[in-house]
Amino acid sequence: AIQQGFDYVPEWDTFLVSAYQKSGPSVIYAVKEGKTVRKVILKNEDGSDFTSHVGGIAHYGAYLYVTDKGGLRLFPLSDFVEDGKAESGSGGFLNTYNNPAFVYIDAQTHYLYTGTFYRAGNYETPESERIKTPGGDENTSVIHVFDITRACNGREMKAEIPVAAYSAPGLVQGMTMTEGSIVLSTSWGLSPSHLYFYPRALQELYSVPEKTYRIGETEVPLYYLESSILQKTVKAPPMAEELVYQDGKILIMNESASDKYIFGKLTRGKYVYGYEVKE
């Protein structure tokens, strides 16, 4: 299996890691105290194998949100943190009006962020996501922001309510937030990964956005993650995926620690790395 998504459930002191397989269903691993304590196979609502790339996962309330084509699949969170479950069936779908590569949920604001992955030639994004920022950057992806408290109610999907859009650079694999920063992870192949830090208070920088962006049928404010407001850049090991911010550290999941990329098992790529944030 090839690791992708990364989440932490503090109530259970458990990390969740999503992974896809070359042949077979996608899976979620539960990791506690440095050890894998369970492996759960993902299933569609009809009982067939769920074979998404599972590039991102995040939990909120009773559900784990997993990236899929066109939106997010919902799975009961209890299936992954309680003993006895070997399979988990999808319990709903949230349309995010994009093909999400990652997902992040801010527990403080109850906002859900889901963005696309761009790489020229093989991972193209829609023309609407190619945006020249006020600072002159040529951004190539967009992060859609939703008020998750209005987007769903248990298993009953209500109308998705987008509230904002963030123009972002290419190669983004994951996102998290610290007390003062929005942090994006970017990576491709064996090149070094990077963590990009931007101010969290974008609404203050762009208090009256000059442009809006259409998500579904809704026009929302458009903000920019661009070099003119970049706080800092941190180099990280190759193949960085999703991020978790915990106890003052950004934890980085690495795709290299898999059978597909054997070098990660033979080198230090098999570890989750932590970057201490000083704000």
Task: Tell where the protein language model's regions lie, with residue ranges.
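Loop/turn-rich, solvent-exposed surfaces of beta-rich toroidal or solenoidal domains
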Residues: A165-T233, M239-E241
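Short coil/turn segments that connect the beta-strands within blades of beta-propeller domains
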Residues: E11-D13, G61-A62, Q108-H110, E179-S181, ...
